[in-house]
From Swiss-Prot:
Residues 69-144 form the ACT domain. InterPro entries: ACT-like_dom_sf, ACT_dom, UPF0735_ACT_dom-cont. Belongs to the UPF0735 family. It holds the Pfam family ACT_4. It comes from Clostridium botulinum (strain Eklund 17B / Type B). SUPFAM superfamilies: ACT-like (SSF55021). This is UPF0735 ACT domain-containing protein CLL_A2896.
């Protein structure tokens, strides 16, 4: 794996990093043509943009052709696991491994690893959709490869 990576919630980072991602998005979407214009709109200097542009990416951009592992805490109800599997399949995810622990105190832990290369959307959309499934109590991102 090239480099050393961390997944960090953007709420704990200085605003400058999110502004670099915003400038990248302006350029990628064709809303601006020049870096100078993108950095001005984003509120950062060109030197800041050039310093970080090759090292900061939106989480969704890193999901092509990768594997992701996440844990779900679900209520012990009939059909929850099949609902999760069906949703992942509908979104184009390829399940590589799935493990469910024995339910204790009415809840079970499920660990899922999927290949994201065929996802219809991005990983954020997938995880948000999974959290909307009835009886899914919590989703925790574990790792991305």
């Amino acid at each position: 794996m090239k480099g050393n990576y961390l997944v960090i919630d953007k709420r704990v980072l200085p605003d400058v990093y999110e502004k670099v991602v915003f400038a990248q998005k302006l350029l990628k979407d064709g809303k601006v043509k020049e870096i100078t214009e993108a950095t001005k709109i984003a509120g950062i200097s060109r030197s800041v943009y050039y310093k970080y542009k090759d090292y900061i990416f939106d989480f969704a951009e890193t999901s092509q052709g990768k594997k992701v592992t996440f844990n779900l805490i679900v209520k012990d109800q009939t059909g929850v696991l099949s609902g999760i599997i069906n949703y992942i399949s509908e979104q184009g995810g390829n399940i590589l491994t799935i493990n469910q622990g024995i339910p204790l105190n009415g809840v079970a832990n499920i660990s899922v690893t999927i290949d994201m290369s065929t996802l219809i959307g991005d990983i954020k959309t997938l995880l948000n959709g999974l959290s909307d499934i009835q009886y899914v109590e919590k989703i925790e991102f574990v790792a991305m490869e």
